[in-house]
């Protein structure tokens, strides 16, 4: 199924009351919607078949026209981070597609800035009023990825820089030297992730998120694959 099913509010973590009605978790709609749009955009880039781009744009436009916010409990930060960067990357792949009306693309940019970016920034700055090391690394990393991706697709160097600065020197476990917290070099050429003591799935999620961050930065001429004497490589 290549259709998407946008929701007015992306809800993650707990049911919420919106306009007098209880709305349960529905974040899977955003996860699927962003993934579908990205895969369609990628197929367009690879095969140069406008049918894929047209469907991806149709799906993204539906989200822009429908979704006005991200909510829930503290897990709202995961929704904003994960789906924020995924939607942004899909849009970036499609920005050269001539069939995307410039006004619709502008609306998409503004949508990212209104719906996802404020939640990304709030987590990186305030982290729900907890100790700055309270949340696992993937929470910080996904919000860094979203901040950087949104900065790129909206042509906002200031937002891009916010994400990069946090990745280098931020206070949360999303900072690279905290996400990869134990470095065995120079004796051994490997390093250990902050999430390694949790489980394999979340540890590999961190690997994937840092890979996304590094590739986003690479597209802008910044090399974080080799940053800090190849720290990411040692973590892999």
Q: How should each PLM-predicted stretch be described?
A:
Residues 1-129, 141, 145, 165-168, ...:
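Extracellular glycan-targeting catalytic surfaces
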Residues 72-76, 134, 179-181:
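Acidic, Ser/Thr-rich low-complexity linear motifs
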Residues 79, 104, 108-111, 131-142, ...:
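Short, contiguous, pocket-lining structural segments
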Residues 146-202:
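Aromatic-anchored, glycine/proline-accented short structural segments
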Residues 51-52, 204-207:
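Short, functional N-terminal and low-complexity linear motifs
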């Amino acid at each position: 199924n290549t259709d998407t099913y946008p929701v007015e509010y992306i809800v993650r973590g707990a049911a919420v009351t919106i306009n007098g009605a209880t709305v349960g978790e529905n974040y899977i709609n955003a996860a699927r919607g962003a993934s579908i749009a990205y895969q369609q955009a990628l197929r367009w880039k690879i095969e140069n078949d406008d049918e894929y781009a047209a469907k991806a744009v149709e799906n993204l436009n539906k989200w822009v026209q429908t979704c006005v916010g991200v909510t829930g409990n503290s897990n709202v930060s995961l929704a904003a981070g994960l789906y924020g960067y995924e939607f942004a990357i899909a849009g970036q792949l499609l920005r050269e597609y001539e069939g995307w009306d410039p006004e619709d693309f502008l609306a998409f940019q503004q949508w990212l800035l209104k719906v996802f970016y404020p939640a990304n920034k709030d987590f990186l700055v305030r982290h729900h009023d907890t100790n700055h090391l309270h949340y696992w690394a993937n929470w910080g990393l996904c919000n860094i990825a979203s901040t950087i991706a949104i900065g790129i697709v909206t042509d906002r160097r200031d937002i891009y820089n916010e994400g990069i600065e946090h990745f280098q020197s931020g206070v949360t476990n999303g900072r690279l030297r905290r996400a990869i917290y134990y470095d065995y070099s120079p004796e051994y050429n490997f390093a250990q992730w902050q999430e390694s003591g949790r489980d394999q799935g979340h540890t590999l999620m961190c690997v994937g998120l840092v890979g996304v961050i590094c590739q986003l930065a690479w597209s802008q001429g910044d090399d974080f694959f080799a940053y800090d004497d190849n720290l990411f490589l040692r973590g892999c």
